[in-house]
Amino acid sequence: MATFVDGPVRVSVPATSANLGPGFDSLGLALSLRDELEAEVLPEGLVVEVEGAGADGVPRDESHLVVRAMRAAFDLMGEQPPGLRLSCRNVIPHARGLGSSSAAIVAGVVLARALIAGGQLLASDEALFDLAADLEGHPDNVAPAFYGGFVISGREDGHWYAVRAGVDPRITAIAYVPPAGVETSVARGLLPESVPHADAAANAGRAALLVAALTGQPEHLLAATRDWLHQDQREAAMPETLALVRRLRAEGVPAVVSGAGPTVLAFGAADTSGLRAACPDGWACHDLTVDAAGATLLT
């Protein structure tokens, strides 16, 4: 029978940007924007407290995504607590393509393991990542949220895999976040069931180039971030996003739709302040770096 730890545990989880242009459902970056969450075992009941981004739109019951992830992780380890308190301080914008749902899922599984004494013996990092990717349905945001940095991920023989790669320290980014979100299910629903072979081949080549560009040859980022498979296809749901991507790219800036959108992510040199002028009225801009740390327990 598992023993639960006394007192609260806290975790910090980064925002993520997936796809990065051609790396659809396979490439992702952790970014320097973090949610912080705290949980503790109670004698009974469930208390969910939320502040910050998206606080008005999330439930305070068992349907809360972090709680669902925690329950799944507790099931994996064979023990449910008698009661739970969860406190979320959200910074990552919701429904904007910056991995808020993956951050919630990763936070949940990490918190659950930390609440069980010897939890590392009951669930390895690989097992938690597998569970988190199962819950999300694709690994490209979950992997960098869990492991940090730049991660190449996918599924092989029924299991998820994630491979970290170093990122050139010269690379920084800016996120242009629109005031209204687009649900991932809507953005994915616009994608065709099949694509021309030539487009798939072109994307494969650019995805390979993107790995080289991010890991040490950033001069190739503009060419490496071109996409044929998903960005233009989503224009109906986010026309202003695609207009900004095209305008930035025409000016030589490597810009992409972040995840399923509608945020735009643009890569820059060490200083991205010059890119702030491109921020549309009413949008928020975040100067970001690649976050080498993934989900981190706080003391």
Task: Please describe what each predicted stretch is.
Residues M1-R96, R113-A114, L121-A123, L288-T299:
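ATP-binding N-lobe of GHMP and related small-molecule kinases
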Residues S12-P14, A145-Y147, G154, A175-P179, ...:
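Short beta-strand segments
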Residues L33, L98-L121, F146-G148:
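DPxDG-like acidic metal-binding loop motif
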Residues E40, A145-Y147, V151-E156, T215, ...:
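Short beta-strand-to-turn element immediately C-terminal to the catalytic PLP-Schiff-base lysine
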Residues A123-I171, L242, L248, A255-V256, ...:
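Alpha/beta catalytic cores of group-transfer enzymes, especially the acyltransferase/condensing modules
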Residues A175-A236:
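Active-site rim beta-loop-alpha module in soluble metabolic enzymes
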Residues A213-T299:
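Glycine-rich, charge-dense phosphate/pyrophosphate-binding loop(s)
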